[in-house]
Amino acid sequence: MSTSARGRRSSVRRSVALALAIVPLGLAACGADDAEKNGTAAKAPAAPARLKITTSDAGEGFRTVATKSIKGGLVELTFTNEGRDPHEAQLVRIDGDHTTDEAVKAYSAEEGALPDWLRLTGGAGIAGPGQTATTTLNLEPGTYAMLDDADFMGPVNSERGALASFEVTEGAPGELPKSTATVTGIDNKIGPPDHEFEASGLKLGKNRLRFATKGTEPHHVVMFPILPGKSLEEVEKFFASERPSGPPPVDFAKAAGTAVLDGDAAEVTDLELRKPGPYALVCFLTDRDGKGKQHLSRGMIKEVEVS
C-alpha cells in the first residue's frame, strides 16, 4: 500500500481520505488559558492576515473561491467545504515562471522528483462535506495555489475546479498561536532511523496541534487508532504492503491528519481525536527526489497513547 510523495492516489491515500472525510476537522478555538480567564493575559499579538478558501460543487466539477491577495507573515487559513465530496487545502508556493497547471501536474505525479520551484507550505487537511478547517501558519511573499488531491477514483480534484491561486505580499513573520499538543517530523543526518516523529500533549477530544518539520524533506502526519489486539509492527506491515491481507489493524473512521509541510516549517491546526487508546502516527510520503521508500518504512511511524 505505498504512496508517492505528491500523487498519493494509491489505495492507502484513498482510504485515508475517506477516513478523514468524516472526521469533524472544523473545530471551535480551544479554551482560554488561566491567565485569560483571570483577566491577566498579556497584550495580544498582532492579528494574522485572513485567508479564506471555499470549495463547492459546480456541475460535474468544483468551484473554489479564495482571497486574491493577502499580506505575508502570519496567516490564518479558514477552509470551508460546501460540497458533497471531501476536499483538502494544500497550499503550495510557485517560484519562478511556472503556472498553477504545472503545479497540479507536479504535485499529483505518481513518480519522479518534486521540482524545486514547488514548495509545500502546509494548509488544511481533508475536510468532509459541510466542514470547516482552520490552520495558522507563516507564508513568504510569492504566488501561491491551493491544490486538492482528495480524489478517490478519477482525476484529482484540482483538475476539476478544486483549485485557486492567490498572491502573498511582503510581511513580517509572526508567532504561531499557543498549542496544546506538538508533533514534529525530524530528518536525521545520521540514521537509522532516517526520519522519525516526536510527539507530546495529544489527548482525547479537541487538540490545537503544532505540527513542525526539522530537516529538508516534506512530511505530514496521519493519526490512526490502533485496534485492540493489534501492534505497531502490524500497522507498519499493513501500510507498507502493496497487497495487504486481512482486515486493517487501525480504525480508519476515526483517523485525523494534517496537510504537507516542507522541511523546517511549522503550523498550528485544530483537529479532534475521537477514540482513547494507542494511536499510530504515520507519514506516507517519500523524499523530494522521489527516491527511496516511504518515510513510514524509514522510521516515521510512532505509537502514542491518547486518553
Map each language-model feature to its residues.
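Extended, solvent-exposed segments with strong compositional bias
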Residues: 113-128, 245-262
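C-terminal motif of bacterial Sec signal peptides marking the signal peptidase cleavage site
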Residues: 26-29
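Contiguous segments within soluble domain cores/interaction surfaces
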Residues: 74, 81-109, 206, 213-242
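Extracellular/periplasmic metallocenter environments
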Residues: 52-61, 67-72, 76-90, 122-191, ...
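Post-signal peptide N-terminal segment of mature Sec-exported envelope proteins
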Residues: 39-54
